[in-house]
Amino acid sequence: MIDLNSRVAIVTGAGGGLGRCYARLLAQRGARVVVNDLGGAAGAVAREIVEAGGKARDEACSVTNPVEVQEMVQRTLTEWGRVDILVNNAGILRDKSFGKMSVEDFRYVIDVHLMGAVHCTKAVWEPMREQQYGRIVMTTSSSGLYGNFGQSNYGTAKMALAGLMQTLAIEGAKYGIRVNCIAPTAATRMTQGILPEEQLSLLRPEFVAPGILALVAESAPTRTILCAGAGSFEVANITLTKGLHLAGDPPSPEELVARWAEVVDRDEEMIPEYGFAQSELELNKAGYIPTQRKGT
């Protein structure tokens, strides 16, 4: 059983939808929960948790304001002594095709989704390092992983969060900090009007929330993109094909085009453990042999 009795969690965008569901489930498993959202929604969810016998407090700060975020984390540390779990869930939509989208709408979505997660993660990073324990979840999306019409701003932010997760998982490993992404599909205020009603009835937030528990548990993985919806769970991977090496100085672009099928062939596809794995693969195919160090 996943027991979070000793843990303190912050959930952003928790005034409704997925965030509310996450906060309630974390509290049911014993975590003390900071419910973050704008307006009075956070207070209502915190009261629900307390009335059900859990421990919660609300914070109405904007994740786009780094000063307010830092103050939220500091109040949490003062009251509860630690922060173990951060679920970066806050988000908005400003959907339009790229040609019709204003730069302001593009930037605003980046500010909320990406920079909001950066501000919150930055605020908890040092406390988690000091306590040698942390669980951080970024909310990515299939719109970022694969693209979606009318969501260039949203997709950009969501793919960037996957990149942020990849690096922070590497940097946090030696401090006991595990960082993952969840890519949810759920019926929320953000998806109303986008998906048909008969689909929304199957995509309840409660069917995504178990994925959050898996990603914040003691046994949580790290550097994983967990997809979740309608009670189904999958993992998305960013992979690298074996590809090919072209002789020539420089290689011929015509030969590259002619042999394109070999470049995209997914046999022996790999999941790189870190960014330099790509250059290591390419140098190896080019016949590079590292210079032996003196004395070895």
Task: Cite the ranges covered by each PLM segment.
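Canonical Rossmann dinucleotide-binding motif of NAD(H)/NADP(H)-dependent dehydrogenases/reductases
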Residues: D3-V34
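A glycine-rich helix->loop->beta "capping" turn
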Residues: N5, A52-K55, R75-N88, R94, ...
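The beta1-alpha1 cofactor-binding region of Rossmann-like NAD(H)/NADP(H)-dependent oxidoreductases
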Residues: A60-E71, V103
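Substrate-binding pocket helix/loop in short-chain dehydrogenase/reductase
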Residues: S97-F98, S102-I110
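Active-site helix of classical SDR
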Residues: T121, A157
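Residue(s) in the substrate-gating loop at a strand-loop-helix junction
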Residues: S141
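C-terminal helical subdomain
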Residues: C181, Q199-Q292
